């Protein structure tokens, strides 16, 4: 009898001193926050997309517009003019995790295969994808460069939040001078080249601004002989008189914070490091978070 009592007391003491775990259901997982990263978008000739990672509320955008194309040469010389270089824009965009950002990387305007002889084109040299205007159809000037842009909450032209303008196409040159080169794209006001005084002070295509140029973002097509097409941009660049280059397309930073935009005839960040004067070739976009 005493042994039973002592045993019962010992068991009760042990149970009182051991805290058995209680289970109140599974813990809820913490919301995940994406680590930092970046994604580079090169030219493809079509729309691309970026899916905003989980936990990300702001992305940083760096973009470069495309260069305009080179026209031929009127007087059988080896001089090769150049299309205007593309501009640069950067800024921060507020986003929602899981949403889609629409990416448009501009293409370089089409150039003559050779600038060492007088060349007649059966078709105009084409403007670069995303807004570059065509060169004229006879002794064709170069095509305008396409703009690079980001669109959010839609894919229409009105959904653009940031734009880097493309350069104007080079007009078919009349001498070994720079009088027919295309205007640089980008900046709040894109470049307009000086008049071509070799042929009666002819006026080149006008660089676009925040309120002037082609509101659909497409550069003008060259209609006068030897004329380069306008660059694509927030507003598209113009095309000018005979033997002149197209105007650059303007940049835009109205839909981002901490934004800046630079014309392609000025110093800007080089995506490979350091700085450069304008973007040559196709455009480029880098998104980081």
Across the structure, where does each feature detected by a protein language model lie?
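Extended extracellular/luminal ectodomain segments enriched in beta-structured repeat modules
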Residues: 53-60, 96-100
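Secretome/extracellular-domain signature
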Residues: 83-202
């Amino acid at each position: 009898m005493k042994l039973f009592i002592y045993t019962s007391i010992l068991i009760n003491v042990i149970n009182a001193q051991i805290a058995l775990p209680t289970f109140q259901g599974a813990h809820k997982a913490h919301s995940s926050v994406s680590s930092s990263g970046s994604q580079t978008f090169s030219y493809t000739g079509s729309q691309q997309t970026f899916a905003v990672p989980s936990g990300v509320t702001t992305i940083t955008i760096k973009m470069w517009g495309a260069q305009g194309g080179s026209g031929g040469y009127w007087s059988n010389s080896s001089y090769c003019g150049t299309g205007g270089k593309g501009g640069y824009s950067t800024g921060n965009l507020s986003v929602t995790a899981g949403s889609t950002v629409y990416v448009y990387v501009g293409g370089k305007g089409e150039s003559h295969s050779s600038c060492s002889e007088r060349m007649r084109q059966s078709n105009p040299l084409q403007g670069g994808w995303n807004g570059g205007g065509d060169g004229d159809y006879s002794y064709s000037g170069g095509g305008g460069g396409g703009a690079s842009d980001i669109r959010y909450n839609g894919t229409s032209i009105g959904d653009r939040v940031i734009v880097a303008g493309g350069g104007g196409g080079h007009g078919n040159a009349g001498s070994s001078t720079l009088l027919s080169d295309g205007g640089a794209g980008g900046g709040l006001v894109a470049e307009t080249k000086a008049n071509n005084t070799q042929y009666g002070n002819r006026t080149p295509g006008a660089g676009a601004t925040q309120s002037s140029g082609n509101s659909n973002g497409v550069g003008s097509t060259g209609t006068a002989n030897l004329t380069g097409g306008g660059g694509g941009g927030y507003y598209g660049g113009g095309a000018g008189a005979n033997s002149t280059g197209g105007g650059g397309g303007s940049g835009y930073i109205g839909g981002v914070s901490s934004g800046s935009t630079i014309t392609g005839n000025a110093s800007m960040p080089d995506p490979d490091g350091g700085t450069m004067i304008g973007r040559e070739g196709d455009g480029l976009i880098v998104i980081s978070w």
